Amino acid sequence: MRKFLVILLVLSPLFLLAHTDHYKNYSNIEMEIFKDDEKIGESIFTFKKEENKFIVKNTTNFEVKLLGVTVFSINIRGTEEYIGDQLISFNSETFQNNKRKYVNLIFDEKKEKFIIDGSSYKGEADKENIIGHWWNHRILQTETQISPLSGSVKRQNIEFLGKEKIKLYNKEYDVEHFRLFSTDPNLPDNKKLNFEIWYDKKKALIIKVAYKRMGLWEYRLKKIQ
């Protein structure tokens, strides 16, 4: 029987630890991006400790071509900063088919809320929100996430689908399989969250992400350093 994640979280001690602790020994995580099983780009996260801050930088680039002509492209640069387990700032700039999107976020300690200036949302958000990036396994805990492209706040549900073994780049992983989807079923299709996620609990790493939108898209974990 499928079980919702809220049950799993009570039982799994790994989820209860500060998430930055899991990544302090990594310098980067590299994911390759595929569409219909053809590589189209990559998403790279780098991790750095500076005094009391934990800093995560992301570069994501991909390009979809049809008959040699680029029909869709993404170029993203973003930086997350944490003190302990608390996100204190996030900034990103995205060019989607040359259209600019952005997010400037800070944590207001007095209000204990995020203040967001984004291309699609300007306002406050609860501090329990996380940035919707695939390096962070806490995306499987939260009820809401902040779009790393535009700053919009999205409500989500998580469903546990089962345990599996998968193989990527000649490596085999024991994973837990989840579905992440929008809470509001009435959202337009292009605004809905609908992802399948394969998570390695022992390593506290998301191994693969897949979704369908005019084809099958996948983010596959290639390298950890």
Q: For each predicted feature, which ranges?
A:
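Sec-dependent N-terminal signal peptides
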Residues: 4-13
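Low-complexity, intrinsically disordered regions enriched in charged/polar residues
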Residues: 11, 81, 124-125, 215
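C-terminal segment of classical bacterial N-terminal signal peptides
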Residues: 14-18
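Acidic, serine/threonine-rich low-complexity disordered tracts
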Residues: 19-107, 138-225
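Hydrophobic, well-structured mid-protein blocks that either form specific transmembrane helices
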Residues: 92-132
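Alpha-helical transmembrane spans
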Residues: 132, 136-138
